[in-house]
């Protein structure tokens, strides 16, 4: 009986920890990156609109793709681990897009286009792997465990 209690405590710590990490990452992505783009890349809301649209497509594709794969493979923890790690890496790398403009809003059209493209691509990759780890992996695993 005591062994089952220990397993239950570990399980709930894992559920709480992974859930917290996932929500913190989504919060950082959704709250901070829009203001980052506006402050460091360009004061142009069109870039943010493109970011939102492309990342919505990326997350939808990732959820269907990795959700199906994890259903067929039955190893959701692998998708959670790989997805969360890559999500974290691309979240960190997103900040490097600031270097394209030197930390100031873009001054020329070519620099602006390069920076805007880099931001949209970085956000799409970050959202893709976030969806792999959190939506297709963690949420499905949690549902299986309940």
Give short role names for the model-derived ranges.
Residues 10-22, 86, 114-126:
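Hydrophobic transmembrane alpha-helices of multi-pass secondary transporters
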Residues 20, 24, 57, 61, ...:
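Hydrophobic/aromatic residues within the transmembrane alpha-helices of Major Facilitator Superfamily
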Residues 48-70, 84-90, 94:
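Central cavity-lining transmembrane alpha-helices of secondary-active solute carriers
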Residues 29-37, 101, 138, 142:
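Hydrophobic/aromatic end-of-helix segments at the C-terminal termini of transmembrane alpha-helices
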Residues 2-58:
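Helix-loop boundary and gating motifs at the non-cytosolic
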Residues 37-38, 69-74:
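Interfacial helix-cap and linker-helix signal at transmembrane-aqueous boundaries
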